[in-house]
Structures are given as C-alpha cells and as structure tokens.
C-alpha cells in the first residue's frame, strides 16, 4: 500500500496512462506514481515521455500514435494486465466540421473514441477476474453540449463509462472525469482563446487529484469544482433546442 498526494491509501500495481506528457494526464501520472504505482506511459512524443519517466522513476515508456491501428496494438497488449487504465489522450481540431478534412475527423475519433473502447476492452477482463481494477476515462463537460465532433466524442466517453460502471463488479470502478476549462497545452494547440474570466479556469493538478480520488472510491461521474457541477446540471437538463441555439451563437 502507498499514499498519494491526497493522503488516500491505494493498492499498488501497474497503471497505464495515455497522453501523460502535459496537463491533466501528466498530473494523473504524478499522482499515481506518488501512490506507488508502476507506470506505463503512452504518447506520440517519445522525448517528453522519457523525460517524464526519468522524473517519476518507476515508469516505462510506450511511444504510440493512438490514431494508428497498428501502432495501437502494443498498447492494447500492455493494457491486458494493468490495475489502473487512464484514457486521457486527446486533442481538438482548429477547423469546424465543414472546414476540416474527413481524415482529420477520423483521426480525432480514433484517438477520442476507438482507442478508449479498445484499451478498455483489453483491460477489463483481467480486472474482473481478479476482482479489482480502476478505469479513469477523461471526458469533458463539453460532452453535455452540441459543439461538433469533439463534444460528440466526449459525450460518447461519458455514456460509455456510465454503462460500464453499471455492468462491472463492485470493486472494478469506471469513472468519467468531466472537467471544465483547465489550463493545459490543449487550448494552445487547438488555437483556442484562453482569455476568459479567471473563475472558468481549473488547475490541472487539482482536477487530476479529484479524478483519481473519485475513481478510487467508485464515483461514476467526476466533475471537479462546484461551479462546473452547477453548469453541468443546467446543461444536462436544459432543452436541447436551447443548447443548439447556444452552439449556433458560438459558431458566429
């Protein structure tokens, strides 16, 4: 047993984390490392993967492009015997659906949806057999609103996680972590405006810590911060026609 930064005890084992080189994924890696887990770190960026592995110590790197079916196979194999699976890898497309190419859209879905499904399918059987396991799928509050392919993919991740949580044994936990705006490289890479009011922005370390804590105790939907919990409640119960109008206003 080992304690994490939040002080909670956790069973030591192996954790596979996709997209750990920055932001929420990196902070989740640090939290699970602090709890005593051996880490398998997965990303396209081999250099930054190795830098993080060197920082954390008990970690191995598995460079892979999760949008590539063949490159994903070794990751699926590695996921078959882990205690924690963290599906965090993700990115956004700068162009709208009408401006992007179908190849861009397909690659996005391969990372945000297909890899989540396939890695989860690989990891779950051993977790169920041993009677213990944790799957933390990083989704987003964007999944509550109709903002194109990214939002649709995150809606899938959330509903997928809820369905699995209802079907798995008691000590195999599946959690969808649904943060709001979080200060990471994600928004810079997607060329998004990050000049919004300060109250909108969350700290990646706090988001990661809350997600790990909630997954460990069996919370199915983890929405860090009271303000985003309130906004999520409104979005989930608002008329769909109203949300479509909000989406239209955003595109103008």
Locations of the language-model features?
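Conserved glycine-rich cofactor-binding loop
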Residues: 21-22
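Conserved glycine-rich Rossmann-like NAD(P)H-binding loop of the short-chain dehydrogenase/reductase
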Residues: 35-51
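Conserved NAD(P)H cofactor-binding loop of Rossmann-fold oxidoreductase domains
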Residues: 88-93
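Substrate-binding pocket helix/loop in short-chain dehydrogenase/reductase
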Residues: 96-98, 104-109
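Active-site helix of classical SDR
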Residues: 120, 153
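Residue(s) in the substrate-gating loop at a strand-loop-helix junction
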Residues: 140
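SDR active-site lid
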Residues: 159, 165-230, 241
């Amino acid at each position: 047993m080992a304690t994490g930064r939040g002080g909670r005890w956790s069973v030591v084992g192996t954790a596979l984390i996709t997209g750990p080189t920055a932001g929420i994924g990196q902070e989740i890696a640090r939290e699970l490392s602090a709890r005593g887990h051996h880490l398998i770190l997965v990303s396209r960026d081999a250099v930054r993967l190795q830098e993080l592995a060197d920082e954390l110590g008990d970690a191995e790197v598995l460079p892979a492009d999760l949008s590539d079916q063949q490159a994903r196979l070794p990751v699926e194999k590695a996921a078959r015997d882990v205690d924690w699976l963290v599906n965090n890898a993700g990115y956004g497309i700068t162009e709208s659906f009408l401006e992007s190419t179908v190849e861009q859209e397909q690659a996005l879905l391969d990372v945000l949806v297909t890899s989540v499904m396939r890695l989860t399918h690989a990891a779950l059987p051993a977790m169920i057999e041993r009677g213990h396991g944790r799957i933390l799928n990083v989704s987003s509050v964007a999944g509550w609103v109709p903002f194109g392919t990214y939002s649709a993919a995150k809606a899938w991740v959330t509903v997928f996680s809820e369905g699995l949580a209802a079907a798995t044994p008691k000590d195999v936990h599946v959690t969808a972590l649904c943060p709001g705006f979080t200060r990471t490289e994600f928004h810079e890479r997607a060329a998004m405006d990050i000049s919004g009011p300060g109250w909108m922005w969350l700290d990646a370390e706090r988001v990661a810590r809350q997600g790990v804590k909630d997954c460990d105790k069996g919370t199915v939907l983890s929405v860090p911060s009271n303000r985003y919990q309130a906004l999520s409640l409104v979005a989930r119960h608002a008329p769909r026609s109203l949300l479509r109008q909000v989406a239209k206003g955003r595109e103008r």
